[in-house]
Amino acid sequence: VGALASAGFHVFTAKSYMSRIRGGLNWFDIRISNRELFAPKEKADLLVALTREAFEILGRETSDGLILLDSHEAQGAYAIPFTQTAKEIGNAIMANSVAAGAVLAVLGLDNKHLMEYLRKQFHDKPAEVVEQNIAAAGAGEKLAQSCAGRLPAAPEGAWDSVYAGADAIGLGAATAGVKFVTAYPMTPSTATLNFLAESADRYGILVEQAEDEIAAINMVCGSTYAGAPSLTVTSGGGFALMVEGISLAGMLELPVVILLAQRPGPATGLPTRTAQGDLNMAIHAGHGEFPKVVFAPGTHQECYAITRHA
């Protein structure tokens, strides 16, 4: 994704990952274009399957497109030994780098952007690790030459950074001047908490992991009362625990800001999925009557701008 962005393409990504307890198939959906994107496609034009299971489950999601399968022979797929090649270079974990090189070959892109990105990504690793990943990407490019294609030209220029929606929210909060962030980790809001924790020194933010959501909302009430712009992040179950604290903020007329990153289902719900089922709860949370403003951003730009406004 970083290499494609640095080449000047617009990139839209979505991911699906299973819980550690249940297990299952993880996948990452990447859509690229020379124009701005706002949603994934229903069918894939290129599938890179690192396991046989991925091929069997996701192979039917391709629109008569190309399938690259790790080592296994299968009808309708090109067999490319990602893992074996990575092992020969140094470590099986570099199969992803082999696959990345193969993808760029299929797309007909210059590999310089991938090589630059790998150096940037592994800048804090030993030089040997950097060179092995570069070699792995180069090997993947050679393995996929037989099915190379050509993408339409990218717009002029390059993107310096690639942000997820959760990152855009965190960046909006940081640049708006938030000084105190506290939360109990609860996916999918944890991604924003992690971004703010990693950016704390740069933006002068105090980040505190609370023991639970009740403590988090009360700490935000206290810090806001003391004059520090504050934020807490949570999901449905955690937001339910915060309701009494939200009512306290209403009584004290404190401008509390809460990120409610929604997951599907009642109670614990589905921790590794996202949804839009908590809007009524957000609007009506708290007893008595006091003003609340509920924003529902729909794009990365809105995630950034609306968070700054909040």
What are the functions of these language-model segments?
Residues 172-176, 284-291:
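Short acidic (Asp/Glu) and glycine-rich catalytic loops that position anionic groups and cofactors
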Residues 1-176, 180-182:
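Active-site cofactor/cluster-binding pocket
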Residues 62-64, 75, 203, 252, ...:
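Short, structured coil segments at secondary-structure junctions
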